[in-house]
Regions:
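Glycine-rich phosphate-binding loop signature in dinucleotide/nucleotide-binding domains
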Residues: 1, 38, 189-200, 253-260
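Asp-based phosphoryl-transfer active-site loop
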Residues: 2-19, 214
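Active-site phosphate-binding/coordination module
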Residues: 26-119
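Hydrophobic packing residues within well-ordered alpha-helices of enzyme cores
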Residues: 51-55, 187, 214, 230, ...
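Short, structured coil segments at secondary-structure junctions
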Residues: 58-59, 67, 161-165, 216-217, ...
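Short hydrophobic/aromatic-enriched beta-strand-loop microsegments
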Residues: 60-68, 81, 124, 169, ...
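Conserved acidic, metal-coordinating active-site core of Asp-based
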Residues: 94, 98-101, 105-216, 225
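Asp-based, Mg2+/Mn2+-dependent phosphohydrolase catalytic module
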Residues: 216, 220-222, 226-263
Length: 263
């Protein structure tokens, strides 16, 4: 069997949205692929510390995380690229001039740093676990690495601030999330590191933010529960995540020949 190089999104691909836990047949499939000699990795926008909280318990040790900025091979972090520092500083200057609150992620943890309470006053607390560090003397000119920036801004106010588009970002309710967003580039860097041919890459995803890693050079598989835009770009559309879609796709292509329910 020819070796393939698998990269899986996490949320709603490997996991059940209702429980946020990995689907048993999907977890089994990851390890069955490894048993068959394939390379298995996660490809996610999650920060490294959040990704390993998911992957360590299930024993997956290869990661393309932080939206492609961070590469982990066999449990060892090889790189974690911050935002372009000049762009990051420019975004923060614009936010300050506009009177918009912001917080910054400066390391691989749930800590975010702020110089005042404007972000919390304008956007409220983030829905995920976050440790807020107040530092009134925070000076972006003295910070060399910024991994994420969150800027408080209502959706209807975006047209008034054209600078928001100077770097890719996600809308997260009442604020904008600026982060590295190049999972495909991360996959390509990983393939170069391990010396694998890119035509043997296989990616699984479900959401529009997975479009970036769907590439004509390799096999792109969309989950049945995925977005229509992603399905249209996919080489193959499998079943829903909760209907064993990951396992069924791997069986369909002959990458595994056993079945989780018939062991």
């Amino acid at each position: 069997m020819k070796k393939k190089y698998f990269f899986f999104d996490i949320d709603a691909t490997l996991t059940d949205d209702a429980t946020h836990k990995i689907i048993p047949s999907a977890e089994w499939t990851l390890h069955e692929l490894e048993r068959n000699g394939h390379f298995v990795s996660i490809a996610t926008g999650r920060a490294h510390y959040k990704t390993v909280a998911f992957t360590d318990p299930i024993g997956i040790r290869n990661l393309v995380c932080c939206g492609g900025a961070c590469l982990v091979k066999d449990g060892v972090m090889l790189e974690n690229v911050p935002l372009p520092i000049d762009t990051a500083r420019a975004l923060i200057r614009h936010a300050e001039e506009a009177g918009l609150g912001y917080i910054m992620m400066l390391d691989d943890s749930d800590k975010v740093f702020m110089k005042d309470f404007r972000f919390l006053e304008q956007a409220g607390r983030r829905t995920e676990l976050t440790t807020y560090i107040l530092d009134p003397d925070l000076n972006i000119e003295q910070i060399d690495a910024i991994y994420k920036i969150y800027i408080a801004m209502a959706r209807e106010d975006e047209p008034n601030h054209p600078w928001v588009s100077m770097h890719g970002h996600l809308r997260m309710g009442s604020y904008l999330n600026y982060q590295y967003d190049a999972k495909k580039d991360g996959i390509l860097r990983m393939m170069k590191l391990i010396g694998g041919p890119v035509e043997d890459v296989v990616v699984f995803g479900d959401a529009v933010n997975d479009l970036v890693m769907f590439d004509k050079r390799w096999t792109s598989i969309a989950m049945g529960n995925g977005m229509e835009e992603l399905k249209q770009k996919a080489d193959y559309v499998t079943g829903d995540n909760t209907a064993d879609g990951v396992m069924r796709a791997c069986q369909h292509f002959g990458w595994i020949d056993r079945d989780y329910y018939r062991l």
